[in-house]
Amino acid sequence: MVMQIPEFIVPLIPWIRGLVGLSLVGAIFLGAMGAVWIERKLSADIQFRYGPSRVGKFGLLQLVADAIKLFTKEDMRPRNADRLLFDNAPIFMMSSVFLMLVAVPVGAVFINGVEYPLAVTEMDISVLYIEAMSAITIFGIFMIAYGSNNKYSLLGAFRNFARMVGYEVPLGITVVSVAIMTGSLNIVEIASSQGLLWNIFLQPIGFIVFFVALMADMGRLPFDQNESEEELVAGWITEYTGMRFGLAFFAEYIHMILGSFLVALLFLGGWNVPAFVANNAVLGLIAPTGFFLLKTLLVLMTIIGMRWAVPRFRIDQVVDLSWKKLLPLSILNLVWAVCLGLYLGA
């Protein structure tokens, strides 16, 4: 059953999908709060604890309690801090994450069998744009560390820089491998071109390299050497309290959701559904985005679960893993992608 729509609505579809995409971007901020709750509940299950259970049903209102706590905490600034950097660095980090959001599609709808991605904007080089915006978050971390005038913060920033330099290389090579298979740097085209044959089946090594490098890029355990509590108190964010801490903390969780989106888009087929679903009047509007968000949730829960299942690596082990293992594997995957692309006629 193909749904027919009035002709005068057809020219408005790009604007409608842009507005829907913008509203979903706003929903991601709520999703970041949900990710905090999921992490607490999942970690509690792994450790045989209850987790949040007192404030609201299933502890859902614990998020509101945390927000009130951050808003009412005293806003402290170290005596010798660089005020300009210290005050504005969390805003810079949040801005860089938001700039990533506008290029990431959060689903798609099918109308009359035609695919309309839900994105604020669609770029021909959206993959490169997202990579660039992700990389500049390191400047926000250095602004925080230098502006804090704290040795632990600065050591954490140096560790972050060493880790990101090492892992951005295999991460970028893996993304190029996926782009070669598609013949495009547009993330919408990469997701759409997979159909029901996902890239995880065509490039399993690339998926492993991308996922591990993405975990390191986000600074999640076992790659959180920049804020290891046993060595650096809280690392680069040691001196922050109140809403400044909240902004940096929030940016980290939004970055984690974006990473989950990228895994689902590049390797798990995005929003692709069978043709009979796409051509259905109702399912074509709901199923693609719902299927995509379900994949994203599963990836997110995997990332969160890794924190409580794998111990933290030493910084030298992290660097060795990048340059001695992931980099050769990413190059091998690149060669495989080129050969496979030539064979398939990409």
Q: What function would you assign to each model-found segment?
A:
Residues 2-346:
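Selective transmembrane helix interface/packing segments
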